């Protein structure tokens, strides 16, 4: 198994449980907790350091851009994935067809569903590329399914959308941070920052290709959307930021102060190394499940879901093992702070 040095990585975190629920929310590294505490204490003391630091937000933008392989000016920062998806939905002409996988996460689907002048069509994830047709304007999908860890054939869907002149929106919330994910082939990508990217809630990312930028209107443009934001705090803005920053929301500083050290940790370790570690743990768990007579949803992601075992989640939590119940499945998700001992503890609990 290609695992990260357990003690070196575990020392970056202070959790006291067997935490196997990154697909819901990641564990904040110690350094991220310290930054949040410093900002909160400064805000409580009524000193300027409590205002929040835009330079830190820019460093987070730069780090995320490196992780997903795009230029910094292609990244917008926000607070929630659904807000960014809403921008994309609002930009579609009436009558447009949007294709989504069956059962995908609600934030990927609902911003299109609430428009009664769009045609939203669904297809099984495994045959999504075949479902793209000449009337398809946009395919919106998660790179990795939240409920069960199934991984999309993004290259196949991209080939199909290119052939039919359709755009793609990829939600990388369950991919970025463990999967080597390249956002550059897609018109739009979104990602929540509080899962595998190890920040807190209130952090999300939107990437927009240069070619697709003019397809979107920055409907929630505030002063941070201006090219010179400090000169745009009052009155109408005179010029939007030249890049994707025009789609920024005013940052939730506590989250972005946490995101800085979290992304720095991921970059220091390397996403390839995290990928090898996380998937090795998932493989160990899958093998153990087979020995116990359980059959998980097939796949190779570090999100492993077992149909029919969702009812065990409460007892596991009482035993200090944190998992999730999703779509009738018991879902365990493994990240850089987990070890083989964590996997074995879960298996032993399921056997008992």
Stretches with model-predicted labels:
Residues 1-352:
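Pyridoxal 5′-phosphate
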